[in-house]
Regions:
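Extracytosolic (periplasmic/ER-lumenal) interhelical loops and adjacent juxtamembrane/interface segments
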Residues: 224-245
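Long extracytoplasmic/lumenal interhelical loops at the membrane interface
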Residues: 238-274
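General structural signal for secondary-structure boundaries
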Residues: 1, 11, 127, 203, ...
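Hydrophobic alpha-helical transmembrane segments of multi-pass inner membrane proteins, especially
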Residues: 15-23, 27-228, 268-284
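Helix-boundary and loop/linker segments of multi-pass membrane transporters
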Residues: 6-7, 131-132, 169, 255-258
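N-terminal membrane topogenic signal
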Residues: 1-18, 62
Length: 284
């Protein structure tokens, strides 16, 4: 199961970069919301152990578990539909006692593993109609289950991930061109429909988020509140930032203008407290 590994071949630079990004993340989350910092530290420890274990695994044997991974995705997504813990109107987490599992997140990794095995198995017939239909059929169940949580953003992300995997797998340009010729107008038509009041394709809050993305000023006090304040926070950090855990009264974070800054908006904290230099280090 494990392979012989020479330390000289180990990518220590990559490991150091991963650790550095995790440390910055822990510091930023601790500054945003102290109560969740310990959970982030635990996640980093578990993640590093998992990374080292997987690094020494024989990947060819790991790929043999791809079907188990796919079934795990489907089963956990079904379970979260019936037994999931709800937050903000969406059931996305399974409470396992010692931690919460978000199946839609594990799905991203396990679907990559599954399709890597799938592409290897059918690489000689990859551009045939039968194989492409199989690939599409396998992605439909997880997409539907994720969408029903509801989780539109992850549904879109997994769809994009699937398209990237197909491209990397060697999808012919003729097929890509045909798909784009259909997909681009379809997306535009879909957006034109869901942006209308009274539409029933998506939920109202999902429509409002789309509208806020295209016209944040109109939704400055609702859906775009954190989005716009994040921009202000990043800009206020200037070159060197205001410092981690600062007590600056003019801070966007300290003024509670980013009430959920420890979530997807954590980069706003990095921008405000570490400035352009700190933000550039994270991005680069």
């Amino acid at each position: 199961m494990f392979r012989r590994y020479k330390l000289k071949n180990f990518d220590f630079l990559l490991v150091l970069l991963v650790i550095a990004l995790n440390v910055i993340g822990i510091l930023a989350i601790g500054s945003a919301k102290q109560s969740v910092q310990s959970k982030q530290i635990l996640g980093m420890a578990v993640g590093l152990i998992a990374m080292l274990v997987i690094a020494f695994l024989d990947y060819s044997r790991l790929l043999k578990l791809a079907w188990i991974g796919y079934l795990f995705v489907i089963v956990t997504l079904i379970l979260v539909h019936f037994f999931g813990r709800s937050a903000n109107g969406a059931a996305r987490w399974l409470d396992l006692g010692f931690f919460d599992l978000q199946p839609s997140e594990t799905a991203k990794i396990l679907l990559i593993l599954f399709y890597a095995q799938f592409i290897m198995k059918y690489r000689e017939q990859f551009n045939t109609m039968r194989v492409l239909l199989l690939a599409v059929l396998f992605i439909i169940p997880p997409l539907i289950l994720i969408y029903k949580q509801p989780n539109l953003s992850t549904t879109i992300l997994v769809s994009v991930l699937f398209c990237v995997l197909m491209f990397v797998g060697g999808l012919s340009w003729k097929i890509i061109g045909g798909v784009l010729a259909v997909a681009v107008p379809s997306v535009l038509i879909f957006l034109s429909i869901v942006m209308q009041e009274g539409q029933t394709l998506i939920k109202d809050y999902q429509r409002n988020r789309i509208m806020a993305f295209f016209d944040p000023a109109t939704y400055a006090d609702t859906e775009a509140y954190q989005q716009l304040n994040s921009v202000i926070a990043i800009g206020s950090g200037q070159l060197w930032g205001k410092g981690l855990n600062n007590t600056d009264i003019a801070s966007v974070k300290n003024g509670n203008f980013l009430p959920e800054s420890q979530t997807d908006f954590i980069f706003a904290i990095i921008g405000e407290e570490l400035g352009f230099i700190g933000s550039a280090v994270v991005i680069l």
